[in-house]
């Protein structure tokens, strides 16, 4: 009977040890990060559920800021960022090694990922600051083209693919 109690105590101690180990692991390790982008301004980082929300917030800022992609942007949601004359922002888009695809059809009203309207003072710079420096940058795929007019668009590395199936593309601009 003494041997039996020792075996029961051993099993109980192993079980309690396993429970303690799992209870010490933070739950955030198991949580999926659903945020697509973050905005950094003056060393303050705010994460957003969508890239569109991040750009909407960044356009309102007067200080230079960085929109950083946190996960691949693929799917049916269309990113349509329009910079207007009221926008006086300086945004750096860090693709962070991810691809960005804007899936549009000819029937959709907003065929462009980024549109700069006449009179805007907005600046957009695209960079890749991922840890994997072998990758030059993300891939921007615009099935219906993109409009950049009266503005400056910088892209440091990566690939910009524009299919002319109804969009205006990049024309007569920097």
Positions of PLM-derived features:
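A structural signal for beta-strand register positions
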Residues: 97-99, 130, 159-161, 166
